[in-house]
Each structure stands twice: as C-alpha cells, then as structure tokens.
Amino acid sequence: IGGHARIGGNTRISQNARIDDKANLYGDIWICGKTHISGNADIRGRIVIADDSRICGDAIIHDMYDYLYFPPSPLDYFLGLSLYRCKDGILVSGKYPKDFTEEFFTGTLEGFIEKIKYFGNYYFVENCLKRIEFAKAYFPEAYFNW
C-alpha cells in the first residue's frame, strides 16, 4: 500500500492486493485476490472486490446495494472501461468522464459506439460484440437495450 492511500473503517485487504496513487477506501470493504487499485480511486460503503479486479483512473464506487463480486473476466476492461453497478446506475473509470448515466448505455449499438468514439477512444472496438454479449448476460437489468 503506497502513494498516500487512505484506508479506514472495517477494511480487509489480502492476497497480493496493490493499492496506490492516493486511493481512498472507507467502510466495510473486503479486497482480495491480486486486486490492483490505483489512480485516485474513491471506494466507500459495503463492498467486496475480488479475483484479479483492476480499478484504475478516477474510479468512484459508493454505496452498493449489496456485495459486488468481480470474477476474472472481460468485465475489467469492458469496451475499454471499467464498469460498476451502484445505486445510482453505472459508474465508469479510466479516462472517461465520471458523470456517465444509465441513459448513456442505452440505445443502439451503433449509437453507443459513436458516443464512445466521441470521447476519443477507438481501441475498444476489437471484440466489441463479444464483450457486449458478456455484459448483457452479466447485467440483465435493462442496462443494455441494444
């Protein structure tokens, strides 16, 4: 743990977790399984992050409805984003704005790609459909209305 990280509450960190770059972690948080958290991440509430998760950029994860478990999967870099579910919809990390809303992720696939391209990222297009199919299976609650 380095880089001026601040950790409070009933946080448990184990199994080769790496936390750096001014990350803030508060609350009943359990982090394990080679997790890498960096880049001013702000994680608060009742959260479990496990199994090779990567949380980077200015990620904000607050107040989950329940524990959230990340299996090792394309979810970590879904379309070049890190993607999280929380009470306010979907938050993303990386170089994207923090104020994405659920509305951003609805509509046609073509519209979604154009919106992402608008923010200056083109490399995600490879394996795009495969990752979308994965996400639709993983988040069935009408987040993805292609």
Task: Give names to the regions the model predicted.
Residues 45-46, 50-146:
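Intrinsic low-complexity/IDR segments
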